[in-house]
Each structure stands twice: as structure tokens, then as C-alpha cells.
């Protein structure tokens, strides 16, 4: 760039910063804060699949799946992890179904958790926006998008048609929220439900509620599914769960995490540590015996998990080693083409090799 252009650019940048404040425009290479801060989801497998060690601060996240697949459990695990880091969390319970006893079992400090049970969708989104603008809240969870009922629908008759009303409400909310969340570095998680499209002959008939705006504004979209039951004898004690990252703007998308959600306990962290440790040769498996650093830790996976639960320091060390090994900076490199392609991905339409 010649000298005159450089002077003109410097003057323009100076004028913009004077008018709109420092940091309103910058060179991309100068912004060292571009490294995204994340909060752990509570599942090591999912943190690794996300490629950044957790869900990103200052962004919108969508978690969707069928009923009883673990959507609310995942958000409560994340709230517990955020509270352990001293962060303030809010739960906007549009479904009016939050169980404080279950939340406490998962490690949530219910005395510090902010909870709102709004009457209308507009009220829920206004509360969400006010919390984001305050700059004092770090994580907001909205449960769920399907329960955000527009005021006109609540005040109308049961048979009235309100075509596109919820989608318009959400579209406007996304436009307002995105900038406020970024400025206050607050994460907003929307839990969503699945619906079936009528008359779809080919392709996946599943879709999420609330129109398309949320799909585009979300930096991360997670598809969570129950794949099987975990039994102790005849009693079912948990779910085998698969979580697919169908959109990711902070790392490479389309990765999957397979984990277990135990009833009343949340993620089976010790089981994940054992499985990933064996896979990456940090835990030795000989027959039914598991060993770590040359010491036998249990016969059978259940006993090895029990050992890690009784020795949290060893579990913490193994977790740290696995994160250092698997969360490489290369995983964070994402081309613009990949990010924009991820905007258009419909879950179920992802090639099997991913």
C-alpha cells in the first residue's frame, strides 16, 4: 500500500475509533482475544469432539434432540462446570419443568442459580436480552424454544392460526441478542425439540422448531440422541448417548461423541476416561485388568471406574493428559468455507464418513 493510502486509512481508523470507541475496528492479526474462551460440557468426549475443549463464550449454542435424550442434563452439567469456575448462570425455564433436586445431584449450586419461569415467549427473550446486556451473567440457558409461545397465541382462542409468529419473534430476538452476547462475553444456550415435516418423501423429515434464524445465528449446534440402555441386572440405570456436532464455527464440524448418562448422576466421566485412556494407550488393558502407570486399578471397567472415583487426583491427572494430547491447536483451524457450509447442514444429511 502506498504512503497516501496508508495515511488515509490511519485517519479513517482514528475517526472510527473516536466515534465508536476503541476496539470497534482492528486488524484481524492484532486481535489476540480472538482465541475463544470455552466452558467444559462435563463430558471429556464431547469437549474433544467440539475441538476447543467446551462450548464457546459470547456465542449462541443450540442443543436439540428427541424427548428424554439428555438435553437438559447436558446444560445442567455445563452450568455446574461454569459455577465451579465462579461464573454466574441463569436458567430460563419456559417449559416450567426444572427439577431443583436433580440439578443439585448434578453439582449445580441451586442457591446461586438464577431461574425465571416466564409467561410468554417475548417475556423470556426480553429477560434473556436484559441479562446479556447487564454484563454480569456468563451463561444463560433457555429451555426450550418450542415452549416460547408468542403473547398473541396465548391471548387468542385455541383454534386460531398463528402462522410464522414464533419464527418472526425468534428472528428479531437473534438479531438483538448476538451483539449483546458478544459484548458481554455471555453464552446463550437454546434447547430445542424435534418435529416431523409433513409430505417429505426423500431425505430426513426431521426439523427443529422456531424457524431458520436460530440455525444461522448459532455458532455450535449439537444433535443429542439416546442409542441404548445401560443395565445392572434387569434394572435400567442409564442411557448410551451419541452427540453429533452438526455445526461448529470454532473448530471442524461433524464430529461425534459417544458417552453414557447415568440416572441421577449425569455423565459417566470415569467411564470416558477409561475408554479414551485405553484408546490412546495411557491406560493399559490386559485381559479384564486395567492398569495406569504400571499400577493395577481394577478388574473389569466397573471396578476401574470405581477406583478413579475414589482417587479424584489420578482422574484429574489423566483428564489433563488426555486434553493436552487431543486438543491440539490444529483442531482450532477452520476455513471460512467449512464454517459457511456448516450453516446449511441439516442433521441426518451429513456423510457417514464424518
Curated annotation (Swiss-Prot):
ATP binds at residues 65-72. GO terms for molecular function: ATP binding; ATP hydrolysis activity; ATP-dependent DNA damage sensor activity; damaged DNA binding; single-stranded DNA binding. The gene is recA. Belongs to the RecA family. It comes from Vibrio cholerae serotype O1 (strain ATCC 39541 / Classical Ogawa 395 / O395). The lineage of its organism: Bacteria, Pseudomonadati, Pseudomonadota, Gammaproteobacteria, Vibrionales. InterPro entries: AAA+_ATPase, DNA_recomb/repair_RecA, DNA_recomb/repair_RecA_CS, P-loop_NTPase, RecA-like_C, RecA-like_N, RecA_ATP-bd, RecA_C_sf. Disulfide bonds: none annotated. GO terms for biological process: DNA recombination; DNA repair; SOS response. This is Protein RecA. One of its GO terms (cellular component) is cytosol. Keywords: ATP-binding, Cytoplasm, DNA damage, DNA recombination, DNA repair, DNA-binding, Nucleotide-binding, SOS response. HAMAP family: RecA. It holds the Pfam family RecA. Can catalyze the hydrolysis of ATP in the presence of single-stranded DNA, the ATP-dependent uptake of single-stranded DNA by duplex DNA, and the ATP-dependent hybridization of homologous single-stranded DNAs. It interacts with LexA causing its activation and leading to its autocatalytic cleavage. It is found in: Cytoplasm. It comes from the Bacteria. PANTHER family: MITOCHONDRIAL DNA REPAIR PROTEIN RECA HOMOLOG-RELATED (PTHR45900:SF1), RECA (PTHR45900).
